[in-house]
Curated annotation (Swiss-Prot):
Belongs to the BMP lipoprotein family. It comes from Haloferax volcanii (strain ATCC 29605 / DSM 3757 / JCM 8879 / NBRC 14742 / NCIMB 2012 / VKM B-1768 / DS2) (Halobacterium volcanii). Residues 42-59 have a biased composition (Low complexity). This is Putative ABC transporter glucose-binding protein TsgA13. Residues 24-71 are annotated as: Disordered. InterPro entries: ABC-Purine-Binding (IPR052910), PnrA-like (IPR003760). The keyword Signal applies. Keywords: Plasmid, Signal. One of its GO terms (cellular component) is plasma membrane. Residues 1-28 form the signal peptide. Pfam families: Bmp (PF02608). Part of an ABC transporter complex involved in glucose import. The complex is composed of two ATP-binding proteins (TsgD13), two transmembrane proteins (TsgB13 and TsgC13) and a solute-binding protein (TsgA13).
Amino acid sequence: MLDEESSIQRRDVLSALGAAGVTTLAGCTGGDTGDTDDTEASETTASEGTTSGTTTGDVETTDGGGPSEGETVNAAWVYISEIGDLGWSWAHDQARQAVDEQYDWLETEYTEAVAPSDSERVFEQYAQGDVDVIFGTTFGYQDPMYAVAEDYPDTVFEHATGYRTRENMGRYMGRIYEPRYLAGQATGMVTENNTIGYVAAFPIPEVVRSINAMALGARSVNPEATFKVRWVNAWFDPPTAREAANALIDEGCDVIAQEQDSPAAVRAASDAGVWTSGYNAPMGQFGGENYLISPIWDWTEFYGPTLESLHEGSWEADAFWGGMETGVPMLDEWGPNVSQEVKDQVAATEEQILNDELDVWAGSAFEGESDEFLFQEMSSFVEGVEGEVPS
């Protein structure tokens, strides 16, 4: 259950991340850069799901749209991929199911496998119905949602990973670079070759942030650790991700990390008998004996307070970019063969992060940079990562 204190803490507003000047952001987790994911998502027919709660009282509507205070809240989620892929969309839908079960005044539904090019139609259909809030969970939905939000001021819109807002449209993301740093420490402690491979999606600030954070974490415990990066140029392409992982292993990497919406790279590492760290969702079942740990999401800690504010009539558009203290970005469970020494090191560092005693970027070229820069401008690697970020 989400208590009042936690709800307030988890609604961390980043006023420094205004929409102005953020137009260079190319894409974000689970989304696309241009039309990259359109083809893939379009190959699967969009499907819908619905679950129901119960109805309670009513009062008045907030300025930003949404239901009257105390009324049933009808919420819809739109996903870029199928929710069974154990990745980005899966993590969001796990949270949808959790809040649906928790609140008897909430009714939820979803549409999966929606290409960005088709998302405006889906958003409009929901807005024309009885939906009070629509969550668009991929970067490529940003402009379509922004357009639809203007035409439906009484509907609340929330967009994941983007930078545009309206009076009735908020945005949200988590500082996944914090658990990435911790997972990086684990990789730095288990590598014997001092060479760690990273299967990356797109060369965009969000992915570069994650690579850099993991490298900084690894080198904080092992200054000799280096990272090799292979770009897949897709969020979900299991065959290519597996090929990239195998290529990195052939180059001498004895630990494989990934930023993909499938466990393909984790599977490849497990098959090759090397350590591995996943992303988005717990992937221990695929890493087996060689599994380390993964940075994952618990979006319940965002969706819960957001829906509560809608139910209470207090919702306002904001820019959520919470860290591990919010419970949104986190680590999953350790693999079966991770040493206590590694666990203790990561636990101690996690405590420092949670107590605001450690800044991931301290001592790097990005120390002291603004949240705006970290969110949308980071475009180069830290020391220890081979090569350059493609332009």
